[in-house]
């Protein structure tokens, strides 16, 4: 999709605050500082529209970005950040679970995993959760520019094995620095949302 218009419409913590215009939605999940904001910025061709932060755990709400009046990206709170209190982590979990299990507009989940490492228990739990609720998933291995391309296939194999990856889902190696994988991510989004466009 060729993106010219993007608007951060709202931050929500409850269904009563979600958008009501019935556009398809793609959720983005991952550990704190895995690169969700960087992925969003790359997809919409902006350098810093979605705020990137050196402070993990900064996203504490569901942030809805309307793209070209055709769909929403929904940035959900990052998980796995130890310095966030247990009570706050539970609150984040409830917000995420309520959205993923009850939102009719949701068309798929982009699950971001740090491509340099094996998936964490939280990464695996999120993937299993999505599969239980039959949510289509695109697994995006981030920060791949920090790994030599000759090792990408090995890392993909390690991640897929840890997740017990379902072949019906899609996997892509991504770099916000080089843009590697960007077109593949957009192709999956367009397919899930039944929209089309040039990148």
From Swiss-Prot:
UniProt entry keywords in alphabetical sequence: Cell cycle, Cell division, GTP-binding, Magnesium, Metal-binding, Nucleotide-binding, Septation
UniProt superkingdom: Bacteria
List of residues binding GTP: 30-37, 57-61, 75-78, 142-145, 174-176
Chain sites annotated for binding Mg(2+): 37, 59
Membrane-spanning residues: none
Matches recorded under InterPro entries: G_ENGB_dom, GTP-bd, GTP-bd_ribosome_bio_YsxC, P-loop_NTPase, Small_GTP-bd
Start and end residues of each EngB-type G domain: 22-195
Name of the protein this chain belongs to: Probable GTP-binding protein EngB
Lineage, highest ranks first: Bacteria, Bacillati, Bacillota, Bacilli, Lactobacillales
């Amino acid at each position: 999709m060729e993106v010219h218009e993007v608007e951060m419409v709202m931050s929500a913590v409850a269904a009563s605050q979600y958008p009501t215009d019935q556009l398809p939605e793609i959720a983005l999940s991952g550990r704190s500082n895995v690169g969700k904001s960087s992925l969003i910025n790359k997809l919409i061709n902006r350098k810093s529209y979605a705020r990137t932060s050196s402070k993990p755990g900064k996203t504490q709400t569901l942030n809805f970005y309307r793209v070209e009046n055709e769909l929403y990206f929904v940035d959900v709170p990052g998980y796995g950040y130890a310095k966030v209190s247990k009570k706050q982590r539970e609150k984040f979990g409830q917000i995420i679970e309520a959205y993923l299990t009850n939102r009719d507009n949701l068309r798929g989940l982009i699950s971001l995993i740090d491509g340099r490492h094996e998936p964490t228990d939280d990464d695996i739990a999120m993937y299993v959760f999505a599969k239980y609720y039959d949510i289509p998933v695109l697994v995006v291995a981030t920060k791949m520019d920090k790994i030599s391309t000759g090792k990408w296939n090995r890392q993909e194999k390690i991640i897929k094995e840890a997740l017990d990856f379902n072949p019906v889902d899609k996997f892509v190696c991504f770099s916000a620095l080089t843009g590697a994988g960007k077109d593949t991510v957009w192709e999956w989004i367009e397919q899930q949302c039944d929209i089309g466009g040039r990148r």
